[in-house]
């Protein structure tokens, strides 16, 4: 089963291809989807746990050698450092929404994704059908119970809606069908309006796709997620 980082794969070819973004832009109109064969009818109940932002963990200096080992066989030792920086940078951009859409329309070569948590959330706690967001001090930002929606979309995401009124930015969640067991990370988006979650490239949350990893991840998980992120996506871009 191919286990790709969905948002990253949309723009990697743009920066690695010698042909430039002119051709790659066409590819982004039909973004790759994750294999859903192992996903249950109620995905949210399969990912219980506490999650932190993925890319600040991936970019820690103690994991640099894992990156180099993963990228060297594909791009060569002389390019491994630069490629690692590129891979991380592709998902650690600050702008999103209309600001990002305007920026990347005028400068396609700078295209990247914001994969951080928004709305003042430092950690997400998934517990059955309840999603809770905690800030950096451990205080609750929100906590709601969610129901599964029957919502089809081109990205293959699984949609949930809060059962509480006035849920604001956390009214809707859209999850890529990743789990810690299959892809060693999660990808998801959230918004007040469902329409903002239908496209990676339009709306108030364009070029944003939160990426998370279990707070209690171990060394083996970090090795696996880096190998997945580096090896499969670089191979796909060749």
Predicted regions: what is each one?
Residues 1-10:
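Positively charged n-region of N-terminal signal peptides that target proteins for export
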Residues 12-15, 45:
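Processing junctions and N-termini across compartments
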Residues 16-20:
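C-terminal motif of bacterial Sec signal peptides marking the signal peptidase cleavage site
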Residues 22-25:
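Bacterial signal peptide processing site
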Residues 27-34:
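Low-complexity, Pro/Thr/Ser/Glu-rich flexible segments characteristic
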Residues 32, 105-238:
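Calycin-type beta-barrel ligand-binding domains and close structural analogs
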Residues 34-52:
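N-terminal helix-cap/turn-to-beta initiation motif at the start of protein domains
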Residues 35-36, 52-129, 172-180:
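Short, solvent-exposed loop/hinge segments that bridge or flank secondary-structure elements
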